[in-house]
Amino acid sequence: YDASGIGSNFDIRQIPLDNVERIEILKGSQSTLYGSDAIAGVIHIVTRKAGNKPFMLSGQASYGSYNSLRTNAAISGRVKEVEYNAGYGLFNTHGISEAIAPAGVTNRFDNDGYRQDNAQASMGFRLAEGIRINPYIRYSKIKGELDQQGFVDETDYSYMAKNTQAGIRNEVQMDKLKLNLLYNYNYIDRSFLDDSTGSRNGYYTFSHAQY
């Protein structure tokens, strides 16, 4: 059962924070530059770019409450007219229960875990004076567990969401005029599974959506 349905809105959870350089908030109408959906404003998320050295390596790891593990690693660099950037990130936690046990219930609700994998790669090429192309690809996979509602535990209710993005950007600088040509492919695959007798209808429940 997918309570949220599926649409063209991007799931912001699938952008790993370790790959974000900065976030800009643009208030007011920005339709001229960003399209008709930007009538009230834009949240502009700028991802990290390649460094100025031929090879750079970065990474980090942390561990916290509820067996939460967060790791990421990235390589980037620039060699003459070519730049590259690639990285992988993982977040995994045993989590807490999505549901709250009502008064009088002594059984401990099971924890609802969560795991997210992210991978991305991009390159930049300078073809000629004022002309650049930037191909990129991003992949994200999220797996998690849910409960039925606020006060009802559910041990076999899970979901998975996968997102693949790929595209290419062409920049042409002509004196004071800058032309950007962008192609982007976005594929979303989500599934929800509840195979316990405690499901909403007492039977096996499955929902699968692609966009």
Where in this protein do the model-derived segments appear?
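Outer-membrane beta-barrel translocator/receptor signature
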Residues: 5-7, 19-21, 32-44, 49-98, ...
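Transmembrane beta-barrel domains of outer membrane proteins
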Residues: 26, 46, 74-78, 87, ...
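Short acidic/polar hinge/loop motifs at secondary-structure boundaries
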Residues: 1-27
